[in-house]
């Protein structure tokens, strides 16, 4: 019983180790695609922050304009 369990475990390890090392080698197209997606997302986040600054600045400007025009009237 114990030998059978050890034999099964060693066979499982012997089949998994080459598969894991094969998966770690070479250029992975999925990794390249994910890296490209991550670069695009970073670029879009930069654009979004620029838009946030513009929108917040415009909102503050409009509120200040309304405040000063109501006091001037």
Swiss-Prot record:
Domain of life of the source: Viruses
Membrane-crossing segments per the record: 45-65
Topological domains, Periplasmic: 24-44
Localization terms from the record: Virion; Host membrane
Signal sequence region: 1-23
Xref: InterPro entries: G8P, Phage_M13_G8P_capsid_dom_sf
Bilayer topology annotation: Single-pass type I membrane protein
GO cellular component: helical viral capsid; host cell membrane; membrane
Ranges per topology, Cytoplasmic: 66-73
Quaternary assembly: Homomultimerizes. There are several thousands of this protein in the phage capsid.
Family of the protein in this entry: Belongs to the inovirus capsid protein family.
Biological role stated in the UniProt entry: Self assembles to form a helical capsid wrapping up the viral genomic DNA. The capsid displays a filamentous structure with a length of 760-1950 nm and a width of 6-8 nm. The virion assembly and budding take place at the host inner membrane.
Record-given protein name: Capsid protein G8P
Organism per entry: Enterobacteria phage fd (Bacteriophage fd)
Taxonomic placement: Viruses, Monodnaviria, Loebvirae, Hofneiviricota, Faserviricetes
């Amino acid at each position: 019983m114990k030998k059978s369990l050890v034999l099964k475990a060693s066979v499982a390890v012997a089949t998994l180790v080459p598969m894991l090392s094969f998966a770690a080698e070479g250029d992975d197209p999925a990794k390249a695609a994910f890296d490209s997606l991550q670069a695009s997302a970073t670029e879009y986040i930069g654009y979004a922050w620029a838009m946030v600054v513009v929108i917040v600045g415009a909102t503050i400007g409009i509120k200040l304009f309304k405040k000063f025009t109501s006091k001037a009237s």
